[in-house]
Amino acid sequence: MKSALNVIGPQVRKYRNLKGWTQSVLARRLQLQGWSISVGSLGKLEAQLRRVPDCEIIFLAKVLGVSTASLFPRIKSLRQLGPQFQSGGKRLAVFPTRSEK
């Protein structure tokens, strides 16, 4: 099982395909907005092989014409995201439970 470095890659691919764009077209449109990204790097992003900083998510949403929230998958459980987000992995954040409030 591959360890995903981002959760938005498949959504980026989905919205790019819905527009009928190649990776080259999307990369060029991102470059015109000021993000120097190569086709190879975009391919790695879509394949979940590279991390995506928050500022890049904003660029992607703007160019694809979608909200930033729409780039994130709908999940019912952290298990859907993969083992790196489950117990035993690194914690992303710790929120108090009702009993701790």
Spell out what each predicted region is.
Residues 20-44:
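Short alpha-helical DNA-recognition segment
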Residues 7-10, 21, 25, 37, ...:
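Residue-level signal for the short linker/turn that defines the boundary of a DNA-recognition helix
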